[in-house]
Structure formats: structure tokens, C-alpha cells
A protein has these predicted regions:
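Short, solvent-exposed turn/loop segments enriched in Gly/Ser/Thr/Pro and often Arg
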Residues: 69-89, 156-164, 289-291, 335, ...
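Secreted, luminal/periplasmic, and some membrane-associated catalytic domains
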Residues: 54, 80, 102-129, 137, ...
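Substrate-binding rim/cap in mid-to-C-terminal beta-strand-loop elements of soluble/periplasmic
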Residues: 364-405, 475-517, 531-536
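Bacterial Sec-dependent N-terminal signal peptides
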Residues: 1-29
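A long, amphipathic alpha-helix that forms part
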Residues: 46, 254-280, 293-334, 513
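His/Asp/Glu-rich, glycine-adjacent segments
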Residues: 92-93, 101-282, 291-298, 421-425
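Second-shell loop/turn segments in exported
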Residues: 43-49, 72-74, 126-132, 251-258, ...
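Active-site-proximal N-terminal segment of extracellular/periplasmic enzymes that hydrolyze or transfer
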Residues: 24-67
């Protein structure tokens, strides 16, 4: 009998031992820390031109030792960083996630407002009241939080509020962005931790002020810059981040100087260290926004010493960031991904100077002419109630009062708009929303970029080389290319250097991250995981 029980015990122990080994061998391996690097204005051409000037541990480490998605394109129309970032983080398009641009025309109050504006929230350190309430889909950061409630930690450090909120989604512990009037870190009460204590400490102990008041001069001798080859009399520049953008403005140039990038790195590293990100087997995430924009720039291409210097200094910041992450967490335990927004290689100004057809489309005069045309057809009324982001809004109430055929009025506007310089097409919104068939077509890309909650009644597109500008002459989106490519790199963790030439779209990034982290994909995700550079379970 003893022998019988001994045999049973040994058998159970054996199977338990085997099961334990199998469980260990099939245990999911995940990166302990995910670091997202979003760079406003980043272009692959710039990285290539400056490659010989970069340090080995910054951009070069990511581009040479990482995975280069060489044919990654945006499958939405360029309308600002908010929609670009939301599309990357959700794996979806504005048709589903709702973020159609940095701003939109609010039909309820007949005004253009920020996509993140929310009067139900409070600002912390700022009068801005913002949230992610218009982001209608979960993000990969949200899914990480939901997969590991109260365990996965996620933070965002950004230069601008729109970028901060879209990177943070709905569930980040805290997001922080730069206030370039009062020169401090600020946030919104929408996120549960409010202003994180590291940002608050920098505001109080002078750390923010120290970095934000650094005078910006060339990093190297001015004649060594590429810009000097086009201008032998190129003079050294000097900027003070606290100087005003214009004579009557309270806003400073801080956000378009290297000081902004230094602030992001400094706070990001403080959060990683003090919050112990990446210290256990539960993945954490930190999203960082940088910029290569310069004060008062008119060109998207690399034409100024200031632009070069922004890249060269950011290269050193990224090198320092990676060195510190390697020390504190280990780059073999960290997954880094780096991407930019949609930006044309050349601005309309530059194209025009080289006799290439291009221009800026301003809606103010155009809408006045459209309204005059409709008055000639239907009577002296205000037929246009608003316009923004290639969306024309008609006065539905007045059209109904006059018992007019709404679709006929829509078509009249479409026909008239085709005569405007720079306009490629004009379509009734119902027609755009109903587009199907080839998902790669220009009309499908337009349909992806529209959401029923914020769409106008007529939607236009512009000719190649043309960009829309608002009433302050600020671009509304910065790319009008039929296919808009963006640099995108993965680096670290278990990845080997590789160039992926297979065409992918930015909606494929979130599902790829989800698969690597072994978490559910965002709930509106339409992309597919990129399979070339890693083995998924």
C-alpha cells in the first residue's frame, strides 16, 4: 500500500514538474517599458541629410539598429497632429475614432473650437479645459491600462495639449504639457493623478525655469552647417525662449526652441526613475512629444541653420534619454517606437519659388463668394453658417424654411466650388460617407477622415501642392500628398536591425504594439499586426 501511494505521489509530482516547465516555457515575454517618441515635423529626408552629423547613440542608434518601416503611409487626410496621433494610437481612422483634426466647426454653437475642448473639466495650472471626450475609441495605452488595472503605469510628457491628450488617451495616470505664457508644466483634471509630482516639483524648485531660459545659439560653428553651403554669408543666430512670438502676443517662442525638447526629456526621465517604470514584469508606457519646428519657419524642408540645430540638439537629447533608460531599465527590456506627423517635403511657398504649381487655400473669401452665389440663386439670406477643415456648413434651418431641396443646394455649392483655384473636388457629405470599394483610393482616404458628428454638408479636396490655412494663416494639416509617408522606427527589446519594405499603414501600428504586449487591440482597430520583424505567440 505504501508503495502504491508513493507511486501516485511520484507520478503527480512528475506531472506537476513537467507542467511547471511547460508553463515557464510558454510564459508570455513582454517588454517591461514602452517608450513612444512622437516628433512634430520629423521627415525621413531630414534624417538622411543629417545622418553624418548625428552622434552614434541618438537617432543613429534607432535608425541603424532598429526596424525601419520604409513604406508606412497615412490612410487619412492631413488635418493636424491630433488626428495623426489618434490614428496611430487607436489603429483606426477618424471615421471611427472621431478625431478629425486639431479643431472642428461645432454646429451647436457655430464656432471653430479645439477637438479637446471640454467645459466639463478643470485646468490644473491653466485656464484650458480639455479632455479626450471626442476620442471615441480606446487606444493601445488604454488597453494596456485595462489589461493590468492598478498595475500598468502610463504617463505622457508633451509640448502641446492636443498632442498630450491624444497620446494619453482616456486612462493615462497623468499627462503634462508646456504652458508657454506662464512658463510651467500644466495639465487637466481629466486624468486621475492630475499634475504628476515630478512636474509640480520642477515648477516649484525652478527646474522648469532653468531649462526654459537657456539662450539658443548654434551648437557648432555656423559655417559647418548645411545651410552655409547655400549662403556663404550665413550669420549665427540667437534666440531667447522667453521672448514673445509677436509684439502684441503673450505667447513666447519656447515651444519652438530646443529648450522645449530638453524639458520633455528631463521630466520624462524623472518620471521613469521616481515612478519606477519598467521595474517589474507588468509593462509600463511613457509617451514623449518632441519638435523640430523653429520660430517663424516658412519651409518644411531643411533650409535653415536653426532647423539643422533643432535636429542636432534633439539627437543629443535622444542619446541621453536612451543612455539613461539603458541604465535604469535596460534597452533589452524596453521597446521604443519613433514616428512623425504628416508633413509635405516642400511647402507651397518653396514650390512656388521654383515655378511648381502650388498655393494656400483661405476659406474666408471663398465662403463669402459661395454665399453670394447662393443669394443670387435663392435669395438674400445667410446660407453658409461656417467652414473649417475642408468642410462647408449650410444653413439647414433656412433651407428648410424656404422649402428648398437640400440636396440641390448641396450640389449647387459643389458645382460652384470646382471653379475655385486650388480645389480638386467637392462632394456632398452623404456621398463621402458612403464611399466603399478600393480602400487605397483618394476618396476612401477622404472618407476615413470624416466623422458624422463633425462633418459639414459639402467636403472639398485640394490639388497637390496646395494647403489650407485658417483665418490666422496657420496651416490646417501640412500634407496634401495623395499618398503621405511618414518615418517610423521600432527599436530595443528583442528586435534586430531590419528594413521592412512591405507597404503598411499607420493603422497597423497599434495592433502591432498590442500583439507585442499580448493585450487586446483597441476597440475600433482596423489595422493588422506587422509580422516581418518579430515572432508572435
Amino acid at each position: 500500500m505504501k508503495s502504491f501511494f508513493k507511486d501516485i505521489f511520484l507520478t503527480i509530482t512528475f506531472f506537476f514538474f513537467i507542467g511547471s516547465i511547460c508553463a515557464q516555457s510558454t510564459a508570455v515575454e513582454r517588454p517591461r517599458l514602452v517608450v513612444g517618441i512622437m516628433i512634430d515635423g520629423l521627415q525621413q529626408k531630414h534624417l538622411d541629410l543629417l545622418s553624418g552629423y548625428f552622434d552614434p547613440g541618438g537617432f543613429k542608434k534607432i535608425t541603424n539598429q532598429g526596424v525601419n518601416l520604409k513604406n508606412l503611409s497615412y490612410n487619412i487626410v492631413s488635418a493636424g497632429n491630433s488626428s495623426d496621433i489618434a490614428t496611430v494610437m487607436t489603429g483606426s481612422v477618424p471615421f471611427y475614432h472621431g478625431v478629425v483634426g486639431d479643431k472642428y466647426f461645432n454646429r451647436i454653437n457655430d464656432r471653430v473650437q479645439s477637438i479637446i475642448w471640454d467645459d466639463q473639466e478643470i485646468g490644473i495650472g491653466t485656464t484650458e479645459t480639455v479632455s479626450a471626450h471626442n476620442l471615441l475609441s480606446s487606444t493601445v495605452l488604454d488597453e494596456l491600462t485595462l489589461a493590468f488595472p492598478n498595475k500598468a503605469k502610463s504617463y505622457v510628457v508633451a509640448i502641446d495639449p492636443e498632442e498630450a491628450v491624444m497620446l494619453g488617451g482616456h486612462t493615462a495616470k497623468s499627462v503634462a504639457w508646456i504652458d508657454d505664457v506662464y512658463m510651467k508644466w500644466v495639465t487637466t483634471g481629466y486624468y486621475r493623478e492630475g499634475l504628476n509630482r515630478m512636474a509640480d516639483e520642477m515648477n516649484v524648485n525652478g527646474g522648469f525655469k532653468t531649462l526654459s531660459t537657456r539662450v539658443w545659439k548654434p551648437l557648432y560653428a555656423i559655417q559647418t552647417y548645411l545651410a552655409a553651403s547655400k549662403n556663404s554669408n550665413l550669420a549665427a543666430f540667437e534666440y531667447h525662449p522667453a521672448e514673445k512670438k509677436s509684439k502684441n502676443s503673450s505667447v513666447t517662442i519656447l515651444k519652438n526652441t530646443p529648450a522645449a525638447n530638453s524639458l520633455v526629456v528631463d521630466l520624462g526621465l524623472k518620471i521613469i526613475e521616481q515612478e519606477k517604470l519598467g521595474a517589474d514584469n507588468v509593462p509600463d508606457m511613457i509617451m514623449l512629444q518632441f519638435t523640430v519646428r523653429t520660430p517663424h519657419e516658412k519651409f518644411f524642408s531643411l533650409q535653415s541653420a536653426e532647423k539643422e540645430d533643432m535636429y542636432l540638439r534633439l539627437d543629443k537629447e535622444i542619446q541621453y534619454l536612451l543612455q539613461q533608460i539603458d541604465t535604469k531599465v535596460g534597452l533589452d527590456k524596453t521597446l521604443v517606437f519613433m514616428f512623425g506627423n504628416q508633413t509635405d517635403v516642400h511647402s507651397p511657398t518653396e514650390l512656388g519659388e521654383n515655378n511648381i504649381p502650388a498655393g494656400y487655400f483661405s476659406a474666408n473669401r471663398s465662403m463669402a463668394l459661395v454665399n453670394s452665389y447662393l443669394m443670387a440663386l435663392y435669395g438674400q439670406e445667410g446660407w453658409i453658417t461656417g467652414y473649417y477643415g475642408k468642410n462647408i456648413f449650410l444653413n439647414k434651418q433656412k433651407i428648410e424654411e424656404k422649402k428648398l431641396n437640400f440636396k440641390e443646394v448641396q450640389q449647387a455649392v459643389c458645382d460652384f466650388m470646382l471653379d475655385f483655384e486650388g480645389v480638386q473636388s467637392a462632394s456632398p457629405t452623404w456621398q463621402v460617407l458612403g464611399v466603399g470599394g478600393n480602400s487605397q483610393s483618394e476618396m476612401a482616404r477622404l472618407r476615413n477622415s470624416v466623422h458624422k458628428n463633425s462633418a459639414g454638408d459639402v467636403i472639398i479636396t485640394l490639388l497637390p501642392g496646395w494647403l489650407e490655412v485658417d483665418e490666422k494663416l496657420n496651416p490646417v494639416g501640412e500634407s496634401n500628398a495623395i499618398v503621405s509617408y511618414s518615418p517610423f522606427y521600432f527599436y530595443g527589446w528583442q528586435l534586430k536591425p531590419q528594413v521592412v519594405t512591405t507597404p503598411y499603414q499607420v493603422t497597423d501600428i497599434a495592433p502591432t504594439l498590442s500583439r507585442i504586449l499580448n493585450i487586446p487591440m483597441p476597440n475600433a482597430c482596423i489595422g493588422k499586426p506587422i509580422v516581418e520583424f518579430t515572432t508572435f505567440p
